[in-house]
Amino acid sequence: MGSTVKNSLLWVFESIEDDPGFMRKRLFGFEAAYVDGLLCLSVGNGEEPWNGLLVCTSRDRHADLIREFPELAPHPVLGKWLYLSQTHEEFEALAGAVVEVVRRRDSRVGVEPAARKKSAKKNRFV
């Protein structure tokens, strides 16, 4: 059974929810934002370091994004993605600015989602 606890950071996606390319999915306890099929952002309100905004990108794009948003840092567990803790005093404004970058289809943000692994079918009737 799924969790009934609502993610308090869903408001971060409000400005792009009407975009025809937008889709939201649950992802490992986070809510993820996809735009045009690319995984772009994820929000979660758990314990640090799972308490804020994840910017889905590749390591080769980190420096450029951090130049624009110095408050972003590589996530301590998922180092390929950038992270902004919701405890940051400017979280709301920064999250809004990052979402605007996604809305503009900035090529620095967004990764192809990993293909699902097919589970081996078990023959239960042998």
Task: Tell me what each language-model feature is.
Residues 58-119:
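Short, structured beta-strand-loop surface elements
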Residues 26-29, 34-77:
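Short, conserved beta-strand/beta-arch hydrophobic-aromatic motifs that form part
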Residues 123-126:
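Catalytic cores of nucleic-acid ligases and guanylyltransferases
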Residues 2-39:
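N-terminal first-folded block
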